[in-house]
Amino acid sequence: MPLLSRKTVVLCGCFSYILCYNESRKCCEVTFMPLNHPITPALLADPEIFQQNRLPFHAHFADQTSPELPLTVSLDGEWNFRYAENLTAPFTDWDTLTVPGFIQMQSLQKPGQPYGAPHYVNTQYPWDGHEKLHPGQIPQDYNPIGEYQRSFTLPENWASCYLRLNGADSAAAVWCNGVYIGYTEDTFTPAEFDMTAAVHPGENTLTVQVYRFCSGSWLEDQDFWRMSGLFRSVELFTKPELHLEDVFVKQSFAEDFSSATVTFDCKVSGAGTVSVVFNGQEQSAEVGEPAEYDSGVVFGKGEADPDVEEDVQDVSFTFTVEHPALWSAEQPNLYEAEIALLREGALMERTGLKVGLRRFELKGRQMLLNGKRIVFKGVNRHEWSCRTGRTVSREEMLWDVKNLKAHNVNAVRTSHYPDDPYFLQLCDEYGLYVIGETNLETHGTWQKLGADGSDEWTLPGARPEWRENVLARAEAMLERDKNHPAILIWSCGNESYGGKTLWEMSEYFRRTDPSRLVHYEGIFWNREYPATSDMESQMYTPVADIKKFLA
């Protein structure tokens, strides 16, 4: 069979077809391939099934390389694509779309807008006025499916193969060579899957179905344009036999900031030597027979998330920095760190990190950064490009950061979801304080549908079937972004009323990362759990109330 290319197409209902375009014969050779484990409406509508076979969350590494083999291969570019109005409707003919990108934004450029258009609603849900649904139910008539397909060639020296979807709106299922790989919700955090058992040497076929609405859509009622698609980069990656799975950089200071203690808590799979170089100092340790990996707080177990465990070993390195150059928006000092993994003296993997040293705390009624009062002069920022929607280029992100700095803005709230990691990297480097916000907003359940705050409508409240789905979103964000010095505050989300689950989220943040504060504006609306937020804020305050407060 000739080399598979973007002209290869796959998957029809429960079955898969590979069409290999023969340039010389100008025709298609069709190979039938059954597709196992089709996604059902019941799965999409179940709030307790929000991920299947998704790997444990971990820190984002901007710089991870190996001299032996390429660790990451980008799948960005043109993909084969087709579209259906719902799970039972017929698919369109095959077309091509660009990844990353939104289906509806690209549909605008095609005659007749065949894949729909962006849809703006504020506090309502996008199905309001079309179908009457209760929380967890999903539209039956209009719930479009975007089916993406492309081929890839497995590098000869890869012993393992993983897939990373950096952003899929709002749910995605993955197959490789017709074999079901996994399922994910939570639009704005990465989902990783192990495809090693499904791939084979040479050419492979990858299929991703993206569903516009799922049960998680009830948790994503942000005031923005509603769209769907693979809107952030898609990557394949492999892991060397000795691999850094995760790292959490922690720090503490002498009371007068004359010295800092910096600890690198690493999780490593495989056996060999782990070496950390930081501030001109080097430490190393041997790792041998690994212990079973426990990712700590685990949400979505059982059917929703089968045990996905890696054999890893914990190892920590602690350094002392005398007279540290502290990080702030005015002076965003960054130290470089390198974590090298070696076996018998040969370098297996290198990970570079930039570390900002700062202490953020609440004393009395004041927030202090490095012992001094801090005032946020900030903005709420949606990810947005007028041409591509929430698929924002690196050039556009840099333009945003430079213009914010030029206008004396020093803080950004990632309203109302985790931003692209590159934007956070820029905030580290240029100096912007960040409130990292969980991908959670249920405005339409409590303000429009459940105005009395009843449990029948309001999400998440204390409803047990939604608890793990909500808490997993907090975990995914924290684990990905925990090493960014720019992030000073974790946010529990936006306009989701109140209740026990939000309080549990705030406690998870404090327990896992006591170096940051926790914010949730919604305690102003629901005082049942006031400890959910470390500080109180209020949106849309009338001018008269502000004058009264300042008097």
Task: Give each language-model segment a name.
Residues 10, 17-21, 26-29:
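Short, positively charged and aromatic/hydrophobic N-terminal segments
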Residues 175-181, 279-280, 344, 370:
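Short strand-turn-strand beta-turns centered on an Asx-Gly dipeptide
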Residues 248, 338-404:
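N-terminal carbohydrate-binding accessory modules
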